[in-house]
């Protein structure tokens, strides 16, 4: 006869309630999570003790998470609302929650019939949740910082990556209890996506093909995983005259914003690396693919050239000081190529309608050199007419390493609003501060 398998000890009621709560929170079902702990609290209100205190804190945590993912707290002006309509800032909400959890950790209000081993579990979980709440406050501050950057001429994504990395390192493995794993997973998914996107933004601006491609792909894959969580959830809608229907849960604003940032970076990536990407497919297929981008920079510039009979529109990459520059596409890390010199330090990484006009390039570089301070303002449009070659040049700089030039083989006025507004529009779309402004729900962008 084989030995009898010992029966597993029954899971304490408290543990089962906690596991259900965090599994709901892990799939962003804030209302279900909140309802469950409130029902449990109502059923145990005579019990008192740490358990009741923790249930109250968890109901507040579910409500705080809902506000956090909605991003409605961004850009709130202190004292700008009446006492009755004022929404508490996310920091106030989480600070209050942190204080509640601290009381459970220290065992204040622990009078009640909770078993000692359960008390220990509740204290341990509350301690880890304190770290989670602190991490949330820091990431909320990070979103606030990104939102305020929308008014800047240039957003330094590399600096943002450094700040986010520091937060991730600070809280790594700080809320690792198995019961909290759904919460930890959803937190990690969010910061991973954000980090991949900000790294991609920094790398596209440095014209680094493979690293930006890898980060965009990683962000895309993780956003798909996240999106499937909402697809699997259905919410039932009861109709006025009976009957009901089910539909997928609407994702929170934070998820939708990360999707928007990814799509904007994808449009910019497909423009900056158009040459390398077009080598992988046919011209007609490439045109179809870029037309799906929003905005479609390639299509927009092609239309402008046809409409105004421009000789050329180029995106120039200033690679001076960039030791790793090797030209379009991917290059083996150990392949050697001599650093560019002279005019090759200013390649046209995009040139429409065909290859860069070599005869105009000395003029373009001369204008870039002479008007450096104007171009470095990242908002001025520079005009130059050369009567020797009967050609007009309009230049602007959307970001530090890149300049857009329009070349006309005829005389054009520096006050021509069509050309200036077009350059401003393309430049603004490449910087896209509107994406950062649209972090706040209801903002245009």
UniProtKB/Swiss-Prot annotation:
Its main location: membrane. It comes from Homo sapiens (Human). Belongs to the KICS2 family. GO terms for cellular component: intercellular bridge; KICSTOR complex; lysosomal membrane; lysosome. It is linked to Intellectual developmental disorder, autosomal recessive 83: An autosomal recessive disorder characterized by developmental delay, mild to moderate intellectual disability, and poor or absent speech. Additional variable features include seizures, hearing impairment, hypotonia, and non-specific facial dysmorphism. SUPFAM superfamilies: FLJ32549 C-terminal domain-like, FLJ32549 domain-like. This is KICSTOR subunit 2. Pfam families: C12orf66_like. The gene is KICS2. It is found in: Lysosome membrane. Part of the KICSTOR complex composed of KPTN, ITFG2, KICS2 and SZT2. SZT2 probably serves as a link between the other three proteins in the KICSTOR complex and may mediate the direct interaction with the GATOR complex via GATOR1. The KICSTOR complex interacts directly with the GATOR1 complex and most probably indirectly with the GATOR2 complex in an amino acid-independent manner. GO terms for biological process: cellular response to amino acid starvation; cellular response to glucose starvation; negative regulation of TORC1 signaling; protein localization to lysosome. Gene3D superfamilies: 1.10.3450.30. As part of the KICSTOR complex functions in the amino acid-sensing branch of the TORC1 signaling pathway. Recruits, in an amino acid-independent manner, the GATOR1 complex to the lysosomal membranes and allows its interaction with GATOR2 and the RAG GTPases. Functions upstream of the RAG GTPases and is required to negatively regulate mTORC1 signaling in absence of amino acids. In absence of the KICSTOR complex mTORC1 is constitutively localized to the lysosome and activated. The KICSTOR complex is also probably involved in the regulation of mTORC1 by glucose. Keywords: Disease variant, Intellectual disability, Lysosome, Membrane. InterPro entries: C12orf66-like_central_sf (IPR038060), KICS_2 (IPR018544). The lineage of its organism: Eukaryota, Metazoa, Chordata, Craniata, Vertebrata.
